[in-house]
A protein has these predicted regions:
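Residue-level detection of the helix-turn-helix DNA-binding "recognition helix"
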Residues: 12, 26, 37
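Helix-turn-helix/homeodomain-like alpha-helical modules used for DNA recognition
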Residues: 61-80
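DNA major-groove recognition helix of helix-turn-helix/homeodomain DNA-binding modules
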Residues: 46-63
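Residue-level "edge-of-site" marker
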Residues: 24, 45, 69
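A short, Lys/Arg-rich alpha-helix, primarily the initiator
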Residues: 1-12
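Short, charge-rich, low-complexity interaction segments located
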Residues: 36-47
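Short alpha-helical DNA-recognition segment
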Residues: 17-34
Length: 80
C-alpha cells in the first residue's frame, strides 16, 4: 500500500499533474483527485491503487517506510 502523501510526493518528483498520472495509470482523473483529498491510506480499490503504484515504480519511484508512520519516496534517475 501507499499513502496519499506518497502519491502526492511521487507526482511532484516526476512533475506530473493528477490528469497525467491518471492517463499513465489507466484510471480516471476524478479517481486520482478523490484519493488525494483523503488522509493516510486512500480508501481505494486495491487494483487501482496497485496500478498507480506500479506506474510510479516504472518511472523510477521507490516507496519507502511505513505508509502511515514514516512514508517516504525516492526517485531513482538511473535508466530514465
Amino acid at each position: 500500500m501507499i499513502s496519499v502523501c506518497q502519491i502526492k510526493a511521487a507526482r511532484a518528483m516526476l512533475g506530473w499533474s493528477a490528469v497525467q498520472l491518471a492517463e499513465r495509470a489507466g484510471v480516471s482523473s476524478a479517481t486520482v483527485k478523490k484519493y488525494e483529498m483523503q488522509i493516510g491510506i486512500p480508501n481505494a480499490n486495491t487494483r487501482i491503487l496497485s496500478a498507480i503504484k506500479l506506474k510510479f515504480e516504472e518511472f523510477g519511484i521507490e516507496f519507502t517506510g511505513d505508509p502511515l508512520v514514516n512514508p517516504g519516496v525516492t526517485l531513482h534517475l538511473n535508466g530514465l
